[in-house]
Amino acid sequence: MKKEIVGMLLAGGEGKRLGQLTRKLAKPAVYFGGKYRIIDFPLSNCTNSGIDTVGVLTQYEPLALNGHIGIGSPWDLDRRHGGVTVLPPYIEKQGGSWYKGTADAIYQNRYYIEQYDPEYVLILSGDHIYKMDYDRMISHHKKLGADATISVIEVPWEEASRFGIMNTNEEMTITQFEEKPTTPISNLASMGIYIFNWSVLKSYLIQDAKQANSSHDFGKDIIPKMLAKDLKLVAYPFEGYWKDVGTIKSYWEANMDLLDEHSSLMLNDPSWRIYSVNRNQPPQYISTRAYVRCSLVNEGCVVHGNVEQSILFPGVHIGANSSVFESVLMPNVKVGENVVLRRTIIMEGACIPSGTHLAPSDPDDILVIDKDTEFSPSIAANQ
């Protein structure tokens, strides 16, 4: 069945800078915002944008991600024609390998795309937090008659070297592009969101696959080669909330942004919902001894202590006389009595013994605790 556009969501990233958070999980599977995983954001964006055919390309530690996505029901992607399909590295008769880069991941799954004979392919990263109407970007691509469109956002100059950076003319045509430059030419950064005319992209992927010296990456190889051949590449400016949660600090900051009433990242917008798997837990219980302020407290939580500027995932238990400040507690965390937590991320299923005090030794850092951590009565550590 022909589709005008197919979405390809790159979700195999290891996320090394997230340390313990991705030790057993792919980065897109990391919990976020009290009831979600990071991948819920691009999947929900697809649903809200009317894109009903999405391939999710997995690789590193895919088990949790596969189980979470399932047949795609939460995102209305459980369809006979299209829907969501999980795509591990592709093994052909001639052999196969792990994905060598972002472009190679798409190349290995070109037959998945070709079965829908699309005009366009939307390439997405599965590890960013944002809400975006891809349909507007598609309209921008068509209106300008582009071969490829890159969604862009202005970033602080001091962070520009972490991104693909470009210059454009007044018509938003891209004139220069550098992947993670030492000395950036601008602060206009690629968001890792691309729309390509499929016939054009396919030819470049086939050429790139034959080149042994290529890194098989969109930013390092495909985009520069298209520019060199004078194809029409245009930028699509995005002005909403977007966060690359690639470090512990940025991940924590994005969670805290949800608690800022002035933030543009709002989860209670009925016109643009973020969908996820429903855990079907009982309602939260806040006891008469509890004090909760400026926090997200989800279903199944039991709170007997103080919770301020924090996010509690489903099934979290906070004991009496305990205080939680500026922290993120993942599902089924148990906090004993007389515990103090400050700027701490507690991973799924961890139990914090009564009397424990947890905080980073540097007040600007974030402490991460997993379920295997051994405790003394008082702990302070660097992260």
UniProtKB/Swiss-Prot annotation:
Q: For binding alpha-D-glucose 1-phosphate, which residues are annotated in this chain's numbering?
A: 99, 164, 179-180, 190
Superkingdom of origin organism: Bacteria
Tell me the GO BP annotations in alphabetical order: glycogen biosynthetic process
Disulfide bond residue pairs: none
Q: Does the keyword ATP-binding apply?
A: yes
Pathway annotation from the record: Glycan biosynthesis; glycogen biosynthesis
Q: Which residues cross the membrane?
A: none
Q: Which reaction does it catalyse?
A: alpha-D-glucose 1-phosphate + ATP + H(+) = ADP-alpha-D-glucose + diphosphate
Give the top-level enzyme category: transferase
Q: Which family does it belong to?
A: Belongs to the bacterial/plant glucose-1-phosphate adenylyltransferase family.
Describe, as the record does, how this protein assembles with itself and its partners: Homotetramer.
Q: What does this protein do?
A: Involved in the biosynthesis of ADP-glucose, a building block required for the elongation reactions to produce glycogen. Catalyzes the reaction between ATP and alpha-D-glucose 1-phosphate (G1P) to produce pyrophosphate and ADP-Glc.
Protein name as annotated: Glucose-1-phosphate adenylyltransferase
